[in-house]
Swiss-Prot record:
The gene is Capza3. The lineage of its organism: Eukaryota, Metazoa, Chordata, Craniata, Vertebrata. This is F-actin-capping protein subunit alpha-3. Gene3D superfamilies: F-actin capping protein, alpha subunit, F-actin capping protein, beta subunit. SUPFAM superfamilies: Subunits of heterodimeric actin filament capping protein Capz (SSF90096). Component of the F-actin capping complex, composed of a heterodimer of an alpha and a beta subunit. Component of the WASH complex, composed of F-actin-capping protein subunit alpha (CAPZA1, CAPZA2 or CAPZA3), F-actin-capping protein subunit beta (CAPZB), WASHC1, WASHC2, WASHC3, WASHC4 and WASHC5. The keyword Phosphoprotein applies. Pfam families: F-actin_cap_A. Keywords: Actin capping, Actin-binding, Cytoplasm, Cytoskeleton, Phosphoprotein. Exclusively expressed in the testis. It is found in: Cytoplasm, Cytoskeleton.
Length: 299
Protein backbone atom coordinates (compact mmCIF):
# COMPACT_ATOMS: atom_id res chain seq x y z
CA UNK A 1 0.00 0.00 0.00
CA UNK A 2 1.29 3.48 -0.89
CA UNK A 3 2.00 5.88 1.95
CA UNK A 4 -0.04 8.54 0.15
CA UNK A 5 -3.32 6.65 0.76
CA UNK A 6 -2.70 6.15 4.49
CA UNK A 7 -4.28 8.35 7.12
CA UNK A 8 -1.97 10.70 8.99
CA UNK A 9 -2.15 8.53 12.12
CA UNK A 10 -1.27 5.36 10.21
CA UNK A 11 1.51 7.20 8.39
CA UNK A 12 2.98 8.31 11.73
CA UNK A 13 2.96 4.71 12.97
CA UNK A 14 4.70 3.45 9.83
CA UNK A 15 7.37 6.16 9.96
CA UNK A 16 8.01 5.59 13.66
CA UNK A 17 8.23 1.82 13.21
CA UNK A 18 10.74 2.16 10.37
CA UNK A 19 12.91 4.67 12.22
CA UNK A 20 13.20 2.68 15.45
CA UNK A 21 14.33 -0.34 13.40
CA UNK A 22 17.37 1.58 12.13
CA UNK A 23 20.59 -0.24 13.13
CA UNK A 24 23.17 1.54 15.32
CA UNK A 25 24.86 4.36 13.44
CA UNK A 26 22.29 4.40 10.62
CA UNK A 27 19.44 6.45 12.10
CA UNK A 28 20.23 9.63 10.18
CA UNK A 29 20.58 7.68 6.92
CA UNK A 30 17.20 6.03 7.47
CA UNK A 31 15.64 9.40 8.30
CA UNK A 32 17.02 11.04 5.14
CA UNK A 33 15.75 8.19 2.96
CA UNK A 34 12.27 8.43 4.48
CA UNK A 35 12.23 12.20 3.95
CA UNK A 36 12.58 11.59 0.22
CA UNK A 37 9.51 9.34 0.30
CA UNK A 38 7.27 11.26 2.69
CA UNK A 39 7.97 14.87 1.67
CA UNK A 40 6.34 16.24 4.82
CA UNK A 41 8.97 18.16 6.76
CA UNK A 42 6.83 18.88 9.83
CA UNK A 43 5.70 15.26 10.19
CA UNK A 44 9.21 13.88 9.69
CA UNK A 45 10.74 16.32 12.17
CA UNK A 46 8.29 15.30 14.90
CA UNK A 47 8.69 11.57 14.27
CA UNK A 48 12.46 11.94 13.95
CA UNK A 49 12.63 13.62 17.37
CA UNK A 50 10.52 10.92 19.06
CA UNK A 51 12.22 7.97 17.38
CA UNK A 52 15.67 9.54 17.84
CA UNK A 53 15.06 9.80 21.59
CA UNK A 54 14.24 6.07 21.70
CA UNK A 55 17.21 5.22 19.49
CA UNK A 56 19.58 7.00 21.90
CA UNK A 57 18.23 5.04 24.85
CA UNK A 58 18.26 1.70 23.04
CA UNK A 59 21.84 1.89 21.77
CA UNK A 60 23.48 4.02 24.51
CA UNK A 61 24.49 6.82 22.15
CA UNK A 62 27.70 8.46 23.49
CA UNK A 63 28.20 12.20 23.93
CA UNK A 64 31.04 14.32 25.26
CA UNK A 65 30.28 17.04 27.83
CA UNK A 66 33.14 19.09 29.25
CA UNK A 67 35.57 16.45 28.02
CA UNK A 68 33.78 13.61 29.82
CA UNK A 69 31.90 10.81 28.02
CA UNK A 70 28.17 10.52 28.64
CA UNK A 71 26.07 7.53 27.60
CA UNK A 72 22.39 8.15 26.97
CA UNK A 73 20.07 5.43 28.24
CA UNK A 74 16.62 5.07 29.73
CA UNK A 75 18.26 5.11 33.18
CA UNK A 76 19.18 8.81 32.93
CA UNK A 77 15.97 10.00 31.27
CA UNK A 78 14.20 12.77 33.16
CA UNK A 79 11.08 13.05 31.00
CA UNK A 80 10.11 15.55 28.31
CA UNK A 81 12.91 14.19 26.09
CA UNK A 82 15.56 15.25 28.62
CA UNK A 83 18.63 13.39 29.91
CA UNK A 84 20.71 13.94 33.05
CA UNK A 85 24.47 13.56 33.46
CA UNK A 86 25.84 12.91 36.96
CA UNK A 87 29.39 13.92 36.05
CA UNK A 88 28.62 17.43 34.78
CA UNK A 89 25.39 17.79 36.83
CA UNK A 90 23.57 19.00 33.73
CA UNK A 91 20.26 18.08 32.16
CA UNK A 92 19.69 18.58 28.46
CA UNK A 93 17.92 17.56 25.31
CA UNK A 94 19.82 15.87 22.52
CA UNK A 95 18.98 16.31 18.84
CA UNK A 96 20.23 13.12 17.21
CA UNK A 97 19.57 14.39 13.68
CA UNK A 98 21.69 17.52 14.22
CA UNK A 99 24.02 15.89 16.77
CA UNK A 100 23.52 18.85 19.11
CA UNK A 101 22.77 19.45 22.79
CA UNK A 102 19.83 21.75 23.44
CA UNK A 103 18.19 23.46 26.42
CA UNK A 104 21.04 22.74 28.87
CA UNK A 105 20.19 23.29 32.55
CA UNK A 106 22.16 22.89 35.76
CA UNK A 107 21.01 20.37 38.38
CA UNK A 108 22.33 19.64 41.84
CA UNK A 109 22.82 16.17 43.31
CA UNK A 110 23.01 15.00 46.91
CA UNK A 111 26.58 14.33 48.02
CA UNK A 112 26.40 11.24 50.20
CA UNK A 113 28.08 7.86 50.59
CA UNK A 114 26.29 6.44 47.57
CA UNK A 115 27.50 9.29 45.37
CA UNK A 116 31.04 8.67 46.58
CA UNK A 117 30.64 4.95 45.78
CA UNK A 118 29.39 5.85 42.31
CA UNK A 119 32.54 7.91 41.71
CA UNK A 120 34.80 5.09 42.93
CA UNK A 121 33.06 2.49 40.75
CA UNK A 122 33.30 4.89 37.80
CA UNK A 123 37.08 5.18 38.25
CA UNK A 124 37.54 1.39 38.41
CA UNK A 125 35.30 0.81 35.40
CA UNK A 126 37.06 3.50 33.37
CA UNK A 127 40.42 1.79 33.95
CA UNK A 128 38.98 -1.47 32.63
CA UNK A 129 37.38 0.18 29.58
CA UNK A 130 40.52 2.13 28.68
CA UNK A 131 42.53 -1.10 28.85
CA UNK A 132 40.16 -3.23 26.75
CA UNK A 133 38.25 -0.91 24.41
CA UNK A 134 39.95 1.47 21.99
CA UNK A 135 37.85 4.65 22.15
CA UNK A 136 35.30 2.91 24.37
CA UNK A 137 32.89 4.76 26.66
CA UNK A 138 31.45 4.04 30.08
CA UNK A 139 29.20 5.68 32.62
CA UNK A 140 27.91 4.90 36.11
CA UNK A 141 24.50 6.18 37.21
CA UNK A 142 22.49 6.19 40.40
CA UNK A 143 18.83 5.35 40.60
CA UNK A 144 16.40 5.06 43.50
CA UNK A 145 13.53 2.58 43.19
CA UNK A 146 11.12 2.14 46.11
CA UNK A 147 13.62 3.68 48.53
CA UNK A 148 16.34 1.28 47.36
CA UNK A 149 19.54 2.70 45.89
CA UNK A 150 21.00 1.10 42.75
CA UNK A 151 24.14 1.72 40.72
CA UNK A 152 23.93 1.19 36.97
CA UNK A 153 27.11 0.82 34.92
CA UNK A 154 26.99 1.08 31.12
CA UNK A 155 29.74 0.29 28.60
CA UNK A 156 29.61 1.15 24.90
CA UNK A 157 31.97 0.66 21.98
CA UNK A 158 30.96 1.19 18.38
CA UNK A 159 32.55 1.18 14.97
CA UNK A 160 30.52 2.85 12.24
CA UNK A 161 32.05 2.75 8.77
CA UNK A 162 29.51 3.32 6.00
CA UNK A 163 32.36 3.58 3.50
CA UNK A 164 33.21 -0.06 4.17
CA UNK A 165 29.49 -0.97 4.32
CA UNK A 166 29.37 -2.24 7.89
CA UNK A 167 28.50 -1.03 11.39
CA UNK A 168 29.05 -2.69 14.75
CA UNK A 169 28.11 -2.05 18.39
CA UNK A 170 29.11 -3.64 21.70
CA UNK A 171 27.26 -2.54 24.82
CA UNK A 172 26.74 -3.93 28.29
CA UNK A 173 24.72 -2.89 31.31
CA UNK A 174 25.34 -3.89 34.92
CA UNK A 175 23.02 -3.15 37.87
CA UNK A 176 23.53 -3.83 41.55
CA UNK A 177 21.91 -2.62 44.74
CA UNK A 178 23.96 -0.78 47.33
CA UNK A 179 23.86 -3.34 50.16
CA UNK A 180 26.19 -4.20 53.03
CA UNK A 181 28.01 -7.56 53.06
CA UNK A 182 26.59 -9.03 49.82
CA UNK A 183 25.04 -7.71 46.62
CA UNK A 184 23.78 -9.33 43.43
CA UNK A 185 24.94 -7.99 40.07
CA UNK A 186 22.59 -8.32 37.11
CA UNK A 187 24.15 -7.82 33.70
CA UNK A 188 23.32 -7.93 30.03
CA UNK A 189 25.84 -7.95 27.16
CA UNK A 190 24.63 -7.10 23.67
CA UNK A 191 26.43 -7.17 20.32
CA UNK A 192 24.97 -6.10 16.99
CA UNK A 193 26.59 -5.96 13.56
CA UNK A 194 25.21 -4.98 10.17
CA UNK A 195 26.98 -5.75 6.89
CA UNK A 196 25.42 -4.38 3.72
CA UNK A 197 27.83 -4.91 0.84
CA UNK A 198 26.42 -7.38 -1.72
CA UNK A 199 24.25 -8.89 1.04
CA UNK A 200 22.18 -7.44 3.89
CA UNK A 201 23.37 -9.38 6.94
CA UNK A 202 22.32 -8.60 10.52
CA UNK A 203 23.85 -10.31 13.54
CA UNK A 204 22.54 -9.82 17.09
CA UNK A 205 23.90 -11.68 20.11
CA UNK A 206 23.05 -11.07 23.77
CA UNK A 207 23.48 -12.74 27.13
CA UNK A 208 21.96 -12.12 30.57
CA UNK A 209 24.02 -12.76 33.70
CA UNK A 210 23.61 -12.83 37.46
CA UNK A 211 26.53 -12.92 39.89
CA UNK A 212 27.07 -12.15 43.57
CA UNK A 213 29.73 -9.89 45.07
CA UNK A 214 30.94 -9.63 48.64
CA UNK A 215 31.01 -6.11 50.05
CA UNK A 216 33.84 -5.21 52.44
CA UNK A 217 34.34 -1.55 51.64
CA UNK A 218 33.80 0.80 48.72
CA UNK A 219 37.25 0.40 47.17
CA UNK A 220 37.06 -3.40 47.36
CA UNK A 221 33.55 -3.40 45.86
CA UNK A 222 34.62 -1.19 42.95
CA UNK A 223 37.65 -3.35 42.11
CA UNK A 224 35.70 -6.61 42.48
CA UNK A 225 32.96 -5.26 40.25
CA UNK A 226 35.45 -4.25 37.52
CA UNK A 227 37.08 -7.71 37.68
CA UNK A 228 33.65 -9.35 37.40
CA UNK A 229 32.78 -7.31 34.32
CA UNK A 230 36.14 -8.14 32.73
CA UNK A 231 35.77 -11.87 33.41
CA UNK A 232 32.21 -12.11 32.08
CA UNK A 233 32.86 -10.02 28.97
CA UNK A 234 35.98 -12.02 28.12
CA UNK A 235 33.98 -15.25 28.36
CA UNK A 236 31.22 -13.78 26.23
CA UNK A 237 33.64 -12.56 23.58
CA UNK A 238 35.34 -15.95 23.34
CA UNK A 239 31.97 -17.71 23.03
CA UNK A 240 30.77 -15.29 20.32
CA UNK A 241 33.95 -15.75 18.27
CA UNK A 242 33.62 -19.53 18.53
CA UNK A 243 29.95 -19.47 17.53
CA UNK A 244 30.56 -17.13 14.58
CA UNK A 245 33.41 -19.32 13.36
CA UNK A 246 31.19 -22.39 13.51
CA UNK A 247 28.36 -20.50 11.81
CA UNK A 248 30.69 -19.32 9.06
CA UNK A 249 32.13 -22.79 8.47
CA UNK A 250 28.83 -24.65 8.37
CA UNK A 251 25.51 -22.83 8.35
CA UNK A 252 26.38 -19.74 6.29
CA UNK A 253 28.28 -21.78 3.74
CA UNK A 254 25.20 -23.92 3.16
CA UNK A 255 22.73 -21.03 3.21
CA UNK A 256 24.56 -18.28 1.33
CA UNK A 257 26.70 -20.32 -1.05
CA UNK A 258 25.85 -22.99 -3.60
CA UNK A 259 27.78 -25.10 -6.05
CA UNK A 260 28.04 -23.60 -9.50
CA UNK A 261 26.11 -25.56 -12.16
CA UNK A 262 28.13 -27.66 -14.58
CA UNK A 263 27.38 -26.59 -18.15
CA UNK A 264 28.71 -27.93 -21.46
CA UNK A 265 27.11 -25.26 -23.64
CA UNK A 266 29.53 -23.59 -26.04
CA UNK A 267 28.76 -20.01 -27.08
CA UNK A 268 30.31 -18.86 -30.36
CA UNK A 269 30.89 -15.19 -29.55
CA UNK A 270 32.64 -14.51 -32.88
CA UNK A 271 29.60 -15.73 -34.80
CA UNK A 272 27.31 -13.56 -32.72
CA UNK A 273 29.44 -10.45 -33.27
CA UNK A 274 29.82 -11.04 -37.01
CA UNK A 275 26.06 -11.52 -37.45
CA UNK A 276 25.16 -8.53 -35.32
CA UNK A 277 23.25 -6.32 -37.76
CA UNK A 278 21.84 -3.27 -36.05
CA UNK A 279 19.13 -0.98 -37.34
CA UNK A 280 19.72 2.51 -35.98
CA UNK A 281 17.00 5.05 -35.28
CA UNK A 282 19.01 8.00 -33.95
CA UNK A 283 16.10 10.42 -33.96
CA UNK A 284 13.96 8.01 -31.97
CA UNK A 285 16.81 7.21 -29.62
CA UNK A 286 16.86 3.41 -29.76
CA UNK A 287 18.43 0.42 -31.54
CA UNK A 288 16.84 -2.86 -32.66
CA UNK A 289 18.47 -6.14 -33.62
CA UNK A 290 17.84 -7.91 -36.92
CA UNK A 291 15.90 -11.17 -36.93
CA UNK A 292 18.88 -13.13 -38.28
CA UNK A 293 20.95 -12.24 -35.25
CA UNK A 294 18.28 -13.52 -32.87
CA UNK A 295 17.88 -16.70 -34.91
CA UNK A 296 21.63 -17.34 -34.98
CA UNK A 297 21.88 -16.70 -31.23
CA UNK A 298 19.01 -19.07 -30.41
CA UNK A 299 20.23 -21.89 -32.65
Amino acid sequence: MSLSVLSRQDKEKVIHRLLIQAPPGEFVNAFDDLCLLIRDEKLMHHQGECAGHQHCQKYCVPLCIDGNPVLLSHHNVMGDFRFFDYQSKLSFRFDLLQNQLRDIQSHGIIRNENEYLRSVVMCALKLYVNDHYPNGNCNVLRKTVKNKEFLIACIEKHSYDNGECWNGLWKSKWIFQVNPFLTQVTGRIFVQAHYFRCVNLHVEVSKDLKESLEVVNQAQLALSFARLVEEQENKFQAAVIEELQELSNEALRKILRRDLPVTRTLIDWQRILSDLNLVMYPKLGYVIYSRSVLCNWII
